[in-house]
Regions:
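Short, solvent-exposed amphipathic alpha-helical segments in soluble enzyme
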Residues: 48-50, 85-86, 132-135
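Conserved acidic residues
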Residues: 30, 86, 114
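Short internal beta-strands
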Residues: 56-61, 67-72, 117-118
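Short active-site-adjacent helix-start/loop capping segments
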Residues: 41-44, 50-52, 65-68, 76-80, ...
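Compact, glycine/acidic-enriched structural inserts
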Residues: 66-95
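Terminal domain-start leader segments
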Residues: 1-62
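Flexible, acidic/His-enriched mid-domain "rim/lid" segments that flank
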Residues: 2, 23, 61, 96-156
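Structural motif
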Residues: 37, 72-73, 118-123
Length: 156
């Protein structure tokens, strides 16, 4: 994709994703669903202005699995301008079952059983999104990955 407003090259984001996958595996998780805009930006460069709408970056712990992004349909042009990610799924606000969509994409990425991390402490994850998402992900066990995902950005 052409990303005229990307802050970093794709190679930098792929390195970040690789480090994220390493931490995900170390934590014994099958993958993660990132909902916090700051984590999504850090990992794929998508600079969301719609942080108040549901979004999700689905990452498998497996290195050969490409991440997928679920966003509102009207936000797609901004993804194309700021990120290299190609697997982007869109939903229509108030018309789509977003939690089911995110869970279905997670299953497509091989996340069907075991433990999955979500940045549960994010302001971008209100109860109206969190509760149906946890239910839709069953039988997977949801774990709080807020610290795991946030720690990727620490400067040592």
């Amino acid at each position: 994709m052409d990303q005229p407003f990307a802050a970093f090259p794709e190679s930098e984001h792929r390195e970040r994703l690789s480090r994220a996958r390493e931490k995900i595996r170390e934590a014994g998780l099958a993958g993660c669903i990132c909902v916090a805009p700051e984590n999504i930006y850090y990992l794929i460069g998508y600079d969301s202005i719609a942080y108040f709408n549901y979004q999700a970056l689905i990452i498998s712990a497996e290195e050969d699995s490409e991440p997928a992004l679920v966003i509102r349909n009207v936000d797609l042009p901004l993804v194309k301008e700021t990120s290299w990610i190609e697997d982007v799924r869109t939903y229509h606000l108030h018309a789509s079952d977003i939690a089911k969509m995110v869970a279905d994409v997670a299953r497509e990425k091989g996340l069907r059983e075991g433990r999955i991390g979500i940045d549960l402490q994010s302001y971008a994850l209100p109860g109206a999104y969190a509760l149906p998402l946890v239910k839709a992900l069953e039988p997977m066990q949801v774990e709080d990955a807020t610290e795991l995902l946030g720690s990727l950005q620490y400067i040592k």
